[in-house]
């Protein structure tokens, strides 16, 4: 039976109504999760009207198709990170970005921090296995910053911003980082189910090694094994 039909039967049986546009997104997400090699990859428009990609290997979107790419960057990463408060009192902000992806989190962080404090110095270290060849542009508000980041990969220093991207296996790359204390960690790898190596206890130990004593780790996942590992490492969860 087709995935669409299975979902329709289930929703009808449970008496649940979902708008047709949202239903189409649900079907796409489910298909890409079940059969990533068959569904392939490509640029997708989210419910918020911005764009993201479906990863050809993991079969997952880089951002939530329902919440939207920029909204996810803000609500899951930047806003909960505590950087809004720190940027008003610190002269320098350090960010460890696990999973550069399309570069959206980095662009949002730079834009928002510089809006609040134009004089703030920002250092960002990012890890990524490989950067997609085709990356959709961000909405107008972030487009110039995002374009500049992509054009100058893997590193640049300008206007008080220092950025460095480590390409390759993040488990090896993170060991190369020394003398860095992150005020915020954006842990944005693919799901623990699809990409478990970036959520292991050993990898989380390496992340903790690079965190400031008042640093904040943020992520989209609520995975119980990940939460257990964080507690074991002494993180305070909220």
Model-derived regions: residue spans:
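The AdoMet/dcAdoMet-binding core of the Class I SAM-like
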Residues: 2-16, 22, 26, 83-180, ...
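Cell-envelope and extracellular/periplasmic
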Residues: 188-190
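S-adenosyl-L-methionine
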Residues: 2-96, 199
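C-terminal substrate-binding/active-site "lid" region of AdoMet-derived donor-dependent transferases
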Residues: 195-238
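Glycine-/small-residue-rich active-site loops that bind phosphorylated ligands and cofactors
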Residues: 101, 192, 218
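Short alpha-helical
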Residues: 69, 104, 172, 224-225
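Short, well-ordered alpha-helix to beta-strand connector turns
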Residues: 181-182, 214
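A generic structural signal for short coil/turn motifs at secondary-structure boundaries
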Residues: 61-64, 175, 193-196
